Design a protein with these regions (language model features):
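Conserved thiamine diphosphate
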Residues: 1-206, 220
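Thiamine diphosphate
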Residues: 91-93, 104-122, 166-331
Length: 331
């Protein structure tokens, strides 16, 4: 929408003197396709239903629906349950609809923190849809590009933390967007990625004490904390695609740490929310497959709660700090 665009998009610019509109994406070249910006009315149920239907009749169009905050998507839960998650299984109708859901614990309270990631993961089976939480611009781009270049259609549920729009570590090189690159279901720690520089040097894989698996914004909180603490015996891995879960790829990544490290899943969400209950069995299978010495996956995150997040900034900050402390405390 033009009305609801945030500062990272500026899809519509308005001249306050004469009230004219300028759409930058319609002024790229003389022979380009038209980019249409529509101010939809504020009914998640109606609008998502329309977009789902549009994705069925126009499969070669990239149809994206973005919630103002992911928390508000539950206003369209009927469409999600009855159509997005199960339409292909029930009626063999394939949809490539993309749902962009701002999700991340940034201190904005219980109505502006959670897209209810756990609900989407609970609906996942039979490869019915994709659930992602991308942490680089390039991976986000390739996830959208893949939607159109595949010869089949699946709904894509994308968590989109707003704080990553201005995070100094959340960047990609220009070549990362090229055809030579692709979508990565798991991303390395910045400290072991040959394309990134300026981070502490980690110990050899045999000396790593903790392997932290996580997804989304919390990775950057942990990365920044580790840089300050100079902890060189803790390595972080990002699960960019939560479903279908990349278990076989994870086997390859975790195998070097099987002899000595302990393995943890870290999330910002309360224990009864987020990805924990969905990914736990997949990760446990991975550890069993690599015959890890410490073969149990453990949880680090908020305690179970009826509310997605606290409404008090001070409590939010203390909870975030507690998660970081647990990750980097000595075993």
């Amino acid at each position: 929408s033009g009305r609801g665009t945030f500062s990272q998009r500026h899809s519509v610019l308005r001249n306050q003197k004469n009230n004219t509109r300028y759409v930058p994406l319609n002024n790229i070249s003389n022979n380009q396709k038209q980019f249409e910006v529509v101010d939809s009315f504020l009914s998640e149920l109606a609008v998502l239903g329309f977009e789902y239907g549009y994705s069925l009749v126009e499969p070669n169009t990239l149809t994206l629906w973005e919630a103002q905050f992911g928390d508000f998507a539950n206003g369209a839960q009927v469409v999600i349950d009855q159509f997005v998650a199960s339409g292909e299984r029930k009626w063999r109708r394939a949809s490539g609809l993309v749902m962009l859901l701002p999700h991340g614990y940034e201190g904005q309270g219980p109505e502006h923190s959670s897209a209810r990631l756990e609900r989407f993961l609970q609906l996942c089976s039979n490869d019915n849809m994709q659930v992602m939480n991308c942490t680089t611009p390039a991976n986000y781009f390739h996830a959208l590009r893949r939607q159109m270049h595949r010869d089949f259609r699946k709904p894509l549920i994308m968590m989109t933390p707003k704080s990553l729009l201005r995070n100094k570590y959340c960047v990609s090189n220009l070549e990362d967007f090229s055809k030579a690159n692709t979508f990565h279901r798991i991303l390395w720690d910045h400290a072991i990625d040959p394309q990134t520089k300026g981070f502490i040097k980690l110990k050899e894989s045999s000396e790593i004490k903790k392997v932290i698996l996580c997804s989304g914004k919390v990775y950057f909180d942990l990365l920044e904390a580790r840089e300050k603490l100079k902890k060189d015996d803790v390595i972080l891995f990002r699960i960019e695609q939560l479903y279908p879960f990349p278990a076989k790829t994870l086997v390859k990544e975790l195998k070097p740490y099987a002899k000595n490290a302990k393995f943890f899943w870290c999330q910002e969400e309360p224990k009864n929310m987020g990805a924990w209950f969905s990914v736990r069995d997949y990760i446990q299978w991975t550890l069993d497959t690599i015959k890890a010495k410490n073969s149990k996956i453990s949880y680090i995150g908020r305690s179970p709660d009826a509310s997605p997040a606290t409404g008090y900034a001070k409590r939010h900050n203390s909870q975030q700090q507690e998660i970081i402390n647990k990750v980097f405390e000595y075993l």
